[in-house]
Amino acid sequence: MGLKNFLEKIEHHFEAGGKLEKYYPLYEAAATIFYTQGKVTPGASHVRDAIDLKRMMILVWFAVFPAMFWGMYNVGYQAIPALNQLYSGAELQQVIAGDWHYRLAQMLGASLTPDAGWASKMLLGAAYFLPIYAVVFLVGGFWEVVFSIVRKHEINEGFFVTSILFSLIVPPTLPLWQAALGISFGVVIGKEIFGGTGRNFLNPALAGRAFLFFAYPAQISGDLVWTSADGFSGATPLSQWSVNGSHSLVNTVSGQPITWMDAFLGYIPGSIGEVSTLMILIGGAIIIFGRVASWRIVAGVMIGMIATAYLFNWIGSTTNPLFAMPWYWHLVLGGFAFGMIFMATDPVSASFTNKGKWWYGGLIGVMCILIRVANPAYPEGMMLAILFANLFAPLFDYVVVQANIKRRKARGE
């Protein structure tokens, strides 16, 4: 019996009147992973396309893979030298034995010696990232199933994207219970209470991270959370620049200066998926050419960022080194690139109109640099900038629509 025949055989149990009727969303979610339903919409279909919501979300899911795999490698790349720098001999073995991440990596065949190869670094990174992703995926999926059963509608695939995006914008050392709490806030408060996928006005992944940032700042920011070596303290390059400008950009493990190319490629500490601008841009090309993300938003963010960075460069400051940061450094440090490509382009919480997308993207670019530079105590502004712009997205669309109405009325007079 083929899979399709099996699914068709049990389908009547989940349909209206069947003994498993209330679990139809679970059946529908499982069945549509492999097959597309004949009826895609319950009402009149005004736009026909070869791609549905599930396929669109899966495209975004695959697009983050380059940043995800590089992020896992970079976790090990940063952690193993730091671990061997802090400890040696019996003390090192004691530290390894006391941390389940290290033990798991060794069970998988990883070496934690100074000469560890790329595979060992990847395995250690996976030992940190995959548990976070598994917890976030299961908890986020649980809430999606609960609300789908209560509301009696199909399970929306948005949580596939939300779960992996959330997992990539947190530090690798984030406690698993906080990961579960953060995604719960993002899905329930940031999305489901407004009606679910398509009705939320905030990006749920960013809403969850913002909750953790304000509720548990010690585990989501600071100098202790970015390198996965017990007891190691190392600031991110963005934090270093805020202290003494470009001269303070130093790899806290090797002691070598950090070049722009190091930051662009992703050899710096940071959130798991935000370190490599190159990998992020590869994923961005996939979703932009796939027409899932809007190039207008990306261009608007870049224009707003470059203009504001030049403005602060022109103003200058003798007390705040961030005034002098060039725009091309803003691009590769912190969460700017990841937020611009994968967060700002969220089709639900962003502006819908073409002109509105330009203004929406521009506001994000301006606010990101404004928060970074004007608030050196928090030298990262992309998360708050996008959430702030989410609130203005409906206003931009309203202004654009009203302007179009007035212009058309004027033509008819």
Curated annotation (Swiss-Prot):
Cofactor(s) required, per the database record: FMN
Enzyme class: translocase
Single annotated GO MF: FMN binding
Compartments where found: Cell inner membrane
InterPro entries referenced in this protein's UniProt entry, alphabetically: NqrB, NqrB/RnfD
UniProt entry tagged with the keyword Ion transport: yes
Annotated membrane topology: Multi-pass membrane protein
SUBUNIT field: Composed of six subunits; NqrA, NqrB, NqrC, NqrD, NqrE and NqrF.
Protein name: Na(+)-translocating NADH-quinone reductase subunit B
Native species: Yersinia pestis
Lineage, highest ranks first: Bacteria, Pseudomonadati, Pseudomonadota, Gammaproteobacteria, Enterobacterales
